[in-house]
Structures are given as structure tokens and as C-alpha cells.
Amino acid sequence: MTEQYQHRARKRFGQNFLHDAGVIDKILRAIRARPEDRLLEIGPGQGALTEGLLDSGAQLDVVELDKDLIPILNGQFASKPNFNLHQGDALKFDFNTLGADPRSLRVVGNLPYNISTPLIFHLLQNASLIRDMHFMLQKEVVERMAAGPGGGDWGRLSIMVQYHCRVEHLFNVGPGAFNPPPKVDSAIVRLVPYETLPHPAKDHRVLERIVREAFNQRRKTLRNTLKLLLTSDEITASGVDGSLRPEQLDLAAFVRLADTLSEKVVTE
């Protein structure tokens, strides 16, 4: 990064710029971009990953919120024919405007940790467009995404991400790889949306509602946390033990509960 392109990281944007060349190379090797790929980078920052992605020959769209980074990114990459920059909030970005074919978009990002969870949920709403996603996230968030039932990490994020995607915790990254160093460890995760959902719900919005309601009071039993949505008999009819706590249920059980609620809403 030359002096011309220096930029101070902003706390309000959750900026921690990746600078470790070894980590950058490891991420690029995990992505393995090809010239025929359609890439979307969220939060390119100072372009640590951007250059390597462009060197693959793939078409690259980038979305950056910080207006002060726009001239820096344009100064470095605007001459590249496969570079297209969008200034705006990725949380509000309409991915359909990219004109990507179904299951063609490869999404990459060193995501600001303060918006990573809502951004993941926004991307899951567009899962039909996405081939895969590679993100740098807070290690704790990746562990929650990849968690299984029965532990404290299993929750709303785990269930909804695993409903849509196969999750791979690839490797961890220490604070020293960033400037300024964050106070937490980071990790790279790969998310691959399913072509065919292994546990399809009748209405994924109802599944989201059931999961949210259940984990709002995760230490209580299901018959207590879901009492405003389902009776104890309806929970039992779903093949679920109402005396269990939410963290003890797997994804398939939550889908059965959601389908019971969907049927109940239709018949009422």
C-alpha cells in the first residue's frame, strides 16, 4: 500500500485491514477463482484480496460502504477490465442487479464483525444465486455456524446457515494478520448452498420464526418457549419431546415443528 493510498481504519465501520501476505495467499488458494467465475467481494477495504481475485481473470464486482475508500480502490483497480465497483451498504444491496445466473455467484469478504450475522442472513435470502461463499469472520461466529446440536454454540445462526448451506471451517487467523489488530481471533469459513435442501421446510419463514422463538429463551423447555405458537400436544405430534431444551434439537426436528405450525396456520 503506497502512501498515496493510505487510509486509517474506522471503528464505526468495523474496519480491520488484512495485510499478512501468507494469509492472503492461503485465502486465495482456498477460493481458487477461475477466469469463467463471477465473483462478488464485500468490504474490499484497501484491496488485499481484490488484486489476487482480479489476477484470476474472473469478473469481479466489489461492494464498499466507506466513501473514502472508493478513490483508493479506483486508483488501484479501475484500469482492470474485469473490475466493477459499487459504493453502498451490502446489507441493502440487491444482488439481483448483478444479473448473475442461478448458482453462479461466488461471494468473498473480510466482513466487518459488527454486521457479519445480519449480512449472512441477507445473503441466505439470495442463496439461489450463489455457488459458494468464503468469509473472514470472528472465530466465535464461525464456530457457531459449524456447531452441532447439544452444545452452547448451537443456535439460530447454526440452524439457519446449515438449513441453506454446507459449512466448512477452513482455518483460523490470528490478530496480527490485520491492521489494526482486532481483539479477537478470526477464521475463514466456506459456505456452499445446497442444490437440493436436505431438510426442506414448507415455509422457511415459519422455520425462522420457530427457531427465533425457541432460542429467545434457550434455557427453557420447548413447551414453554413455543407455547404461543404450538400446544404441547402439537409439539409431541411433530415427533419432538417438549421437555427438551432448544439446543438439544437437530435441524430436522426444527423443520418438523415449523411444518406443524405451517399446517396449523393454514387450517385456522
Swiss-Prot record:
Q: Report the protein name in the record.
A: Ribosomal RNA small subunit methyltransferase A
- In terms of superkingdom, the source organism counts as Bacteria
Q: State the reactions this protein catalyses.
A: adenosine(1518)/adenosine(1519) in 16S rRNA + 4 S-adenosyl-L-methionine = N(6)-dimethyladenosine(1518)/N(6)-dimethyladenosine(1519) in 16S rRNA + 4 S-adenosyl-L-homocysteine + 4 H(+)
Sum up the protein's function in the record's words.
Specifically dimethylates two adjacent adenosines (A1518 and A1519) in the loop of a conserved hairpin near the 3'-end of 16S rRNA in the 30S particle. May play a critical role in biogenesis of 30S subunits.
Q: What is its main location?
A: cytoplasm
Taken from the UniProt entry, a GO cellular component term is: cytosol
Which keywords does the record carry? Answer: Cytoplasm, Methyltransferase, RNA-binding, rRNA processing, S-adenosyl-L-methionine, Transferase
Record lineage: Bacteria, Pseudomonadati, Pseudomonadota, Gammaproteobacteria, Pseudomonadales
User: Where does the record place it?
Assistant: Cytoplasm
> Per UniProt, what is one Pfam family of this protein?
RrnaAD
The family assignment reads:
Belongs to the class I-like SAM-binding methyltransferase superfamily. rRNA adenine N(6)-methyltransferase family. RsmA subfamily.
The scientific name of the source species is Pseudomonas syringae pv. syringae (strain B728a)
Identify the HAMAP family for this entry: 16SrRNA_methyltr_A
Gene coding for it? rsmA
Q: Which GO terms describe its molecular function?
A: 16S rRNA (adenine(1518)-N(6)/adenine(1519)-N(6))-dimethyltransferase activity; RNA binding
For this protein, the record's InterPro entries field holds: KsgA/Erm, rRNA_Ade_diMease-like_C, rRNA_Ade_Mease_Trfase_CS, rRNA_Ade_methylase_Trfase_N, rRNA_adenine_dimethylase, SAM-dependent_MTases_sf
